[in-house]
UniProtKB/Swiss-Prot annotation:
Full protein name: Eukaryotic translation initiation factor 3 subunit J
Region of interest: Disordered: 1-83, 223-277
Location in or out of the cell: Cytoplasm
Gene Ontology CC annotation, any one: eukaryotic translation initiation factor 3 complex
GO molecular function: translation initiation factor activity
Subunit structure: Component of the eukaryotic translation initiation factor 3 (eIF-3) complex.
HAMAP family per UniProt: eIF3j
Coiled-coil regions listed in the entry: 37-82
Family in the record: Belongs to the eIF-3 subunit J family.
A biological process term (GO) from this entry: nuclear-transcribed mRNA catabolic process, nonsense-mediated decay
Length: 277
């Protein structure tokens, strides 16, 4: 019997393959073996930070919008408090700015509205504008302290006669005002020593001129004091006793008669006729 004539079935392995395919795997299959848990954590953290940043930006925008609304409300309240004429001027200016801005948008931003003014703002009111300018000037003004050197001030850098006179007048008015606070300290600690210090660079001739000027001042003050003293005492500035007061005029006895020594015989009333015998 030949092997070719026999019939027999050859077992197939397809069933086994199908069984492998039909099996259900509950475990998730990773797409890649290179995924690191730390990378996953970093990615998740980055997403959370991005979300928090987005929320913060949104909140900031909401706060900014609220701030603008409050500012606009305040501007309108201030605008309502203005007088009628000022309101009309500001409204006219706002309308003009709006027309210029519309024209600039129409012509593609050719700078039609660039006239140096911003959009309508309540701060453009003349009084408010002046107040802001003064405030800005005060802020930009250098702060002077006791340690600030005076020679840095432009006033202490004179170059001509007019500037020296301005310096003299300014110093004179400022320093003499200190005598009102304390005349004793002004005289002993400032005026006398300051005059001496100022005469140090002078020549002998100019120093004598200073002395002559002071002598004139002394004589003038002596005359003023003497005038005030004599005026209080009733005298004159030259030292005299002053004008004598006129005596009141005597009133004549109209209708009376002239009396003489014979008219009054009262002294002989006590004598009798026998006294003459």
């Amino acid at each position: 019997m030949a092997w070719d004539d026999e019939d027999f079935d050859i077992p197939s392995n397809s069933k086994t393959a199908v069984s492998w395919e039909d099996e259900e795997d509950d475990d998730p299959v990773l797409e890649s073996w290179d995924i690191d848990p730390e990378e996953e954590a970093k990615k998740k953290k980055a997403e959370q930070e991005a979300e928090a940043k987005k929320k913060a930006e949104l909140k900031a925008k909401e706060d900014e919008a609220k701030k603008k609304r409050d500012a606009k409300k305040k501007e309108m309240e201030e605008f309502d408090g203005l007088d009628e004429r000022t309101r009309k001027e500001l409204l006219k200016k706002a309308e003009l700015n709006a027309d210029l801005n519309n024209a600039a948008d129409l012509f593609g931003g050719l700078g039609v509205a660039e006239d140096g003014d911003e959009d309508f703002d309540i701060n453009e009111h003349p009084r408010e504008k002046a107040r802001l300018a003064a405030l800005q000037a005060a802020r930009s003004k250098p702060v002077l302290t006791k340690d600030t050197p005076l020679e840095d001030h432009p006033l202490f850098q004179p170059t001509n006669k007019q500037e020296y006179e301005r310096l003299r007048k300014t110093l004179g008015a400022t320093l003499t005002a200190l005598s009102e606070d304390s005349s004793l300290l002004y005289a002993s600690s400032l005026a006398i020593d300051l005059i001496r210090d100022l005469t140090q660079p002078l020549s002998v001739e100019n120093t004598r001129k200073v002395v002559s000027t002071l002598n004139v001042v002394v004589k003038d003050k002596e005359r003023q004091e003497r005038t005030a003293r004599l005026k209080k005492a009733g005298g004159t500035s030259t030292g005299g006793a002053g004008k004598k007061k006129a005596k009141p005029a005597a009133r004549p006895n109209v209708g009376g008669f002239k009396k003489d020594e014979f008219d009054d015989m009262g002294a002989f009333d006590d004598l009798d006729d026998d006294d003459f015998m």
